[in-house]
């Protein structure tokens, strides 16, 4: 039987601002990537999200991003490899403390937004991020875009790597995600998104916006928690994957 991890970016509320339906979405995912205060989240939200995920039996990972609350960490910012290393170590440490306080441990690390996309193409940045994860805890799993520089850097570093695919994003022929600045970046039709995921998991293929099929590895599927239809989509995709005889299981 085919199996795949379903991960979601959570804990992205902060202060008086509520983003997403974290508690409900946790019913449908196997792994949670929790924001660590730079692109979103705050200490109280981090603590509450950790507790909710533990109560649901969901694996927990750090979701470090660029220090850009206004841009939600989705705007590219020029940073050095050293700065990338420092901000990843810092944010892993912050979430690790909350997990330790709850008597638990972290399972993985997945960079957020622009940091994730920059590292997917930039060897120097990707190596710094992989090194940061390895130096904090070599047993952590690194989540990276399938086949990207980040995933390859993690493997070279000796980390276990989960090659990630996206349910609601379109792909370019080089395996990267279509920029959110483009009108065709998002897949808003649930049925099309489900079809894309099932094919990626079962066949290791995805159809690009250029009209070509490319190969990729699908260890984990990302669903975004900040969209207005996120909860309904989480319900739909988990139900349809099970109907397609695909087992939902946290990455190990």
Swiss-Prot record:
Q: Which UniProt keywords apply?
A: ATP-binding, Hydrolase, Nucleotide-binding
EC number(s)? 3.5.2.9
- Give the Gene Ontology MF terms in alphabetical order: 5-oxoprolinase (ATP-hydrolyzing) activity; ATP binding
Query: Looking at its record, which EC class is this enzyme?
Result: hydrolase
- CDD domains (UniProt xref): LamB_YcsF_like
Q: Which InterPro entries match?
A: Glyco_hydro/deAcase_b/a-brl, LamB/YcsF/PxpA-like
List the catalytic activities from the record.
5-oxo-L-proline + ATP + 2 H2O = L-glutamate + ADP + phosphate + H(+)
**What Gene3D superfamilies has UniProt attached to this entry?**
Glycoside hydrolase/deacetylase
What is any one GO biological process for this UniProt entry?
carbohydrate metabolic process
What does the protein in this record do?
Answer: Catalyzes the cleavage of 5-oxoproline to form L-glutamate coupled to the hydrolysis of ATP to ADP and inorganic phosphate.
NCBIfam families in alphabetical order: PRK05406.1-3 (NF003814), PRK05406.1-5 (NF003816)
Q: Which family does it belong to?
A: Belongs to the LamB/PxpA family.
Subunit info here reads: Forms a complex composed of PxpA, PxpB and PxpC.
Name the PANTHER family for this protein.
5-OXOPROLINASE SUBUNIT A, UNCHARACTERIZED PROTEIN YBGL-RELATED
Protein name, entry field: 5-oxoprolinase subunit A
User: What are the top taxonomic ranks of the organism?
Assistant: Bacteria, Bacillati, Bacillota, Bacilli, Bacillales
């Amino acid at each position: 039987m085919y199996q795949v991890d379903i991960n979601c970016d959570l804990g992205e509320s902060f202060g008086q601002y509520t983003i997403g339906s974290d508690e409900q979405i946790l019913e449908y995912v196997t792994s949670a990537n929790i924001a660590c205060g730079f692109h979103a989240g705050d200490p109280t939200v981090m603590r509450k999200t950790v507790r909710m995920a533990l109560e649901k039996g969901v694996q927990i990972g750090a979701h470090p991003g660029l220090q850009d609350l206004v841009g939600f960490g989705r705007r590219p910012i020029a940073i050095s490899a050293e700065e990338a290393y420092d901000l990843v170590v810092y944010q892993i440490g912050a979430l690790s403390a909350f997990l330790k306080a709850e008597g638990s441990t972290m399972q993985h690390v997945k960079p957020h937004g622009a940091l994730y996309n920059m590292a997917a193409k930039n060897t120097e940045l990707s190596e710094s991020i992989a090194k940061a994860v390895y130096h904090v805890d070599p047993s952590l799993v690194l989540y990276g875009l399938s086949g990207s520089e980040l995933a390859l850097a993690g493997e070279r570093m000796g980390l276990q790597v989960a090659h990630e695919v996206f349910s609601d994003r379109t792909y370019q022929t080089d395996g990267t995600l279509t920029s959110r600045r483009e009108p065709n970046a998002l897949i808003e039709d649930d049925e099309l998104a489900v079809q894309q995921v099932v094919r990626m998991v079962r066949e290791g293929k995805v159809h690009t916006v250029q009209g070509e099929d490319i190969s990729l590895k699908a260890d984990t599927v990302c669903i975004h928690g900040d969209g207005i239809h996120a909860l309904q989509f989480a319900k739909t995709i988990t139900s349809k994957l099970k109907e397609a005889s695909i087992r939902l299981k946290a990455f190990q």
